[in-house]
Every structure is written in C-alpha cells, then in structure tokens.
Amino acid sequence: GLKRPQGMSEMRDAGKRWVNFPEIQAACGVKIVAPKLENAIAGTTLHLANTSEQKAEAEQSIREEWRGIYDKMPIMCSVCKKVSPRVEFITNCQNGTCKGAIEEKDGVVIKADTVGGLEALAFELFKLKIPVRQATVGPVNKKDILMAKSIQDPLNQAILGFSTKPNTEVADELSSDESEIAFFSGSIIYHIIDAFEEWRTAKQEE
C-alpha cells in the first residue's frame, strides 16, 4: 500500500493519520507498506525492476549511491591530520602530498533515520573539521557503542543521532550518568551540534 500523511500532518508526526493512494508522484513523502521491507533504508532511491536485468541495474545503482555517501564522509589523514571528505583525502593526501597516508581510525559515530539526514549531519561535522568514524542509518545499537568505545581520542567518543533513537538493548546504557559514551540526539541538527560542541569544550577543560 502507498500512504501519505493526512492534511498538513508531517511525515514523522502523522501517527495514525494516513491516507491510502493508488499512485504517487515523484519527490513526495510516502509510506510504503509491503512484506519483506525489514532491510529497506529510508531516504534511498526507489527502483522498479520487472526483469533480472533491471534488478541488476538497480543493485548497481544502489551500490553507486552508497559509494557516493561513503566518499563524502569527513575523515582525518594520518600524516597531516587534516580532516576532509574521503574522496579528497585519497586525491590530495594519499595520492598527493602525504605519501603513504592512511585513514585515521578516529572520529565520532553518526546515525540518522534517512540517508539524507546522514549526509546533512556529516556535512555539518565537516565544517567543524570533526572526522566521522562510522555512519549508518537506523536506531543506535550495541555495535555503534562498541565502535565509539574503540575511539582513542576522548573528544570523539560520542554518538550523534539525527531523528533516531537507541534501541531497547542500549537505551538504558546511553542514558546512564556512568555511560562511557556521550550521546546526542534530536530532530534539529544544529541543536545536536551545539550540544556536542559544548560537551567537547567542557571535556577539554577537565
């Protein structure tokens, strides 16, 4: 089924206020109800495949889409310590002035409910020259916490979530005052970034 929010309701706040549609136009918010969508990722391109060839083309397109997102993530060069999008790091550092450079295994963990949200959060972090160690769509889970704990720089031992929350397995751990990992989440990116920067400043003054 194809559903859109009723009236002026927002996608995230529609609750049970949804209206069925026989068809939809491009570039509109839509909720798709169908079987076997457990691994679908919100915000990605919707492909229609009626043949095996079309399916193969769609799969290749999806891989390229994810590759584009991967290349945009800000990372730190092991030699010059400059933070830049991964594709620029390869061009300017690995193949340029910093021969033998590798990607520093440092940076924050970011989460979002859609691919677009992930890109937006990564872009704001890049402007602050903060590297991203891992970026994935969906609720915060145990693997995300383990990744954040493995970061050596204490100023980057944090998880930033845009419009996403921890799953039930890790919710209590992240909300605890004794949590080893700082967790910042919300539906407004600038509020998340501001809270994160305040935490880093306080951390530096300890």
What are these regions (language model features)?
Residues 1-206:
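C-terminal effector/interaction modules appended to NTPase cores
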